[in-house]
From Swiss-Prot:
The keyword Heme applies. This is Cytochrome c-552. Heme c 3 binds at residues 98, 213, 216-217. SUPFAM superfamilies: Multiheme cytochromes. Residues 1-26 form the signal peptide. It comes from the Bacteria. GO terms for molecular function: calcium ion binding; heme binding; iron ion binding; nitrite reductase (cytochrome, ammonia-forming) activity. GO terms for cellular component: outer membrane-bounded periplasmic space. Substrate binds at residues 220, 268. GO terms for biological process: anaerobic electron transport chain; nitrate assimilation. It comes from Edwardsiella ictaluri (strain 93-146). The keyword Signal applies.
């Protein structure tokens, strides 16, 4: 047996302790580093922030006062024809308060009546601008996993109304201290801003205020097999640049069954039109006009989260820059809205006729070669019209841009109809193509053979049975408090 001196024993024992102890310390350090890199858990339940941020929470909750449902199809039945074959022909209401974002996407006929998680018609992407649960699911499961599957799959997960964690890093020390802690909660929005050379983390506070709004108030499309959200900004954010992008990738939202034109549907390009308008050009942010600083009962200033019409808080919004009185500015805006609306209706009349005349041309025996340039004009005209009207505040944000877009839309629609006259004549049709009665929403939908009673009944069954199940599952899992 080899004898070891006491001194050598102490050296060996110390070395062993250092070796194994150091390993434990390294493991602990690695674990801490991993925890630091892990994204913070996102709290999607908005009422959890009522106590630390009472004024902001109360004003956010007050968006429920903006409850009016305004049926855009009933107001303008031409839209039914322009969106024939697309879900918007079933149902399209004007926007209302943020408190209703989740309710409205559940209740609209556009999302159908899926009775099972795998049922259609819409993809998961249709939740993307409706709830902070979207950011939570992306953080927990990854972006690809979030987008996979149909809209109904997300029902038990996406259960809290659009709120705090959509725009703020609610887990940060800054937010706890009462600072804005603005962040982009949608990774696809961050990528889009990078594409136009405006990375969020390098932007100033004013730019970031508009960027967080621009996560949702933008044009987007569903890309690839899993229908992931992408902003079409690779070539820029103007109507012409986005049109060129879509044409370059041969993207089509749907084919209008009347004309067989491959159509594009603009969503709500508020960020793009604001950016092009006088307010955006002068760095007046969305927050400056729609979320002003106001005083609470104790005289303390806070940012109102009752996002709405700037005229409702005139002294805190418009008055900070403009010298005119409220009535004068309201008249100016009303006149701009009237000007935009007049040309909008002219474009719609031309496009409605173009779709029906194209249908007649096909029926008369027109060839694809004859129709291709006509369908391109219809596609481009309606895209420019839609880009104008889908941005609901364009008459305020960028009226000159809206008028230019509508002017080019009118030209292209008229050009399509001029070509259609020749094609129809070549195939023996010399009389005017008759139009069905589309003077009301119901008549327009009837002209397309839409069974609205069936759609409505199926939706009501869905709301009465499936939605309560979603909410019960969410409460059971702790994702919904009430």
């Amino acid at each position: 047996m080899i004898k070891v001196s006491n001194a050598l024993q102490r050296i060996l024992i110390g070395a062993a302790l250092a070796l194994f102890g150091g390993g434990a310390q390294a493991a602990a350090a690695d674990s801490a580093a991993a925890a630091e890199k892990a994204p913070p858990k996102i709290e999607a339940r908005n009422d959890r922030f009522a106590a630390p941020h009472p004024d902001q929470y109360a004003s956010w909750k007050a968006t429920a006062e903006q409850s009016e449902i305004s049926d855009a199809l009933a107001e303008d039945p031409r839209l039914v024809i322009l969106w024939a074959g697309y879900a918007f022909a079933k149902d399209y209401n004007k926007p209302r308060g943020h408190a209703y974002a989740l309710t409205d996407v559940r209740e609209t006929l556009r999302t159908g009546a899926p009775m099972k998680p795998e049922d259609g018609p819409q993809p998961m992407a249709c939740w993307s601008c409706k709830s902070p649960d979207v950011a939570r699911v992306i953080a927990e499961q990854g972006e690809a996993a979030y987008f996979h599957g149909m809209w109904a799959r997300g029902g038990p997960e996406i259960v809290n109304a659009l709120g705090c964690a959509d725009c703020h890093n609610t887990a940060s020390d800054d937010f706890a201290a009462g600072k804005p802690a603005l962040q982009l909660s949608r990774p696809y929005a961050a990528r889009a801003l990078e594409a136009i050379g405006k990375p969020f983390d390098k932007a100033n506070r004013i730019d970031q205020q508009s960027m967080v709004c621009g996560q949702c108030h933008v044009e987007y499309y569903f890309s690839g097999k899993d229908k992931t959200v992408k902003f079409p900004w690779d070539q820029g954010t103007s109507v012409d640049e986005i049109e060129a992008y879509y044409d370059g990738i041969a993207f089509t939202d749907w084919v209008n069954p009347l004309s067989k034109a491959p159509m594009l549907k603009a969503q709500h390009p508020d960020y793009e039109t604001w950016r092009a308008g006088i307010h955006g050009q002068n760095n007046i942010s969305c927050v400056d006009c729609h979320m002003p600083k106001v005083q609470n009962a104790e005289g303390k200033l806070y940012t109102s989260h009752k996002i709405g019409n700037p005229f409702d808080s005139f002294e805190q919004t418009c008055r900070t820059c403009h010298t005119q009185d409220k009535a004068t500015l309201q008249q100016t805006v009303a006149k701009r809205k009237q000007d935009v609306n007049e040309i909008k209706l002219k474009v719609e009349d031309q496009l409605v006729r173009a779709h029906f005349e194209a249908k007649a041309a096909w029926a008369a025996g027109a060839s694809e070669a004859e129709m291709q340039p006509i369908l391109t004009d219809i596609r481009h005209a309606q895209w420019r019209w839609d880009f104008s009207i889908a941005s609901h505040g364009v008459h305020m944000h960028a009226p000159d841009v809206a008028l230019r877009m509508l002017g080019t839309a009118l030209d292209k629609a008229a050009n399509a109809r001029t070509q259609l006259v020749r094609v129809l004549a070549n195939h023996g049709v010399n009389d005017a193509v008759p139009l069905p009665d589309i003077s009301t929403k119901a008549l327009a939908q009837q002209a397309l053979g839409m069974n609205m009673q069936q759609f409505t009944q199926e939706k009501q069954t869905f709301l009465n049975t499936v939605v309560p199940e979603w909410e019960a599952q969410a409460r059971s899992a702790g994702r919904l408090d009430h």
